Amino acid sequence: MKTAIFTVVLALAVFAVLSFGWEANEKALSEGFTELIHEKEAASETEARECRYFWGECHDHMPCCDWLVCRYKWPITYNICVWNRTFPEK
């Protein structure tokens, strides 16, 4: 009986150590992924957009793209760019 209890306690200790190692590895991966996302986000912010895209917030100083129009939609409390039922010419 003592051997069985000792084996169970030892197995639980091994599982605890393995899960701690897995958590540390997962945290390192998530930090690396977060850094990568922030780098991509910073790179995209440097590019100036000349128009707002679909469902983007729009005002007079932030116009929508050519195939979109700025409209007020009820559940949203600000104007958004919606499709004006035309297609952009290439």
UniProtKB/Swiss-Prot annotation:
On the tree of life, the source organism's domain of life is Eukaryota
* Tissue localization of expression: Expressed by the venom gland.
Disulfide topology: C51-C65, C58-C70, C64-C81
GO terms, molecular function:
ion channel inhibitor activity; toxin activity
Can you list the GO cellular component terms from the UniProt entry? Answer: extracellular region
Q: Where is the signal peptide?
A: 1-19
User: What Pfam family is a match for this entry?
Assistant: Toxin_12
> What compartments host this protein?
Secreted
Recorded hits in InterPro entries, A to Z, give: Huwentoxin-1
Q: Which residues form the propeptide?
A: 20-50
- Its principal location? secreted
Going by the UniProt record, its keywords in alphabetical order are: Disulfide bond, Ion channel impairing toxin, Knottin, Secreted, Signal, Toxin
Q: Which family does it belong to?
A: Belongs to the neurotoxin 10 (Hwtx-1) family. 13 (Hntx-13) subfamily.
Q: Give the protein's biological function.
A: Ion channel inhibitor.
In the record's own words, the domains note is: The presence of a 'disulfide through disulfide knot' structurally defines this protein as a knottin.
This protein's name: U7-theraphotoxin-Hhn1a 7
Q: Which organism is it from?
A: Cyriopagopus hainanus
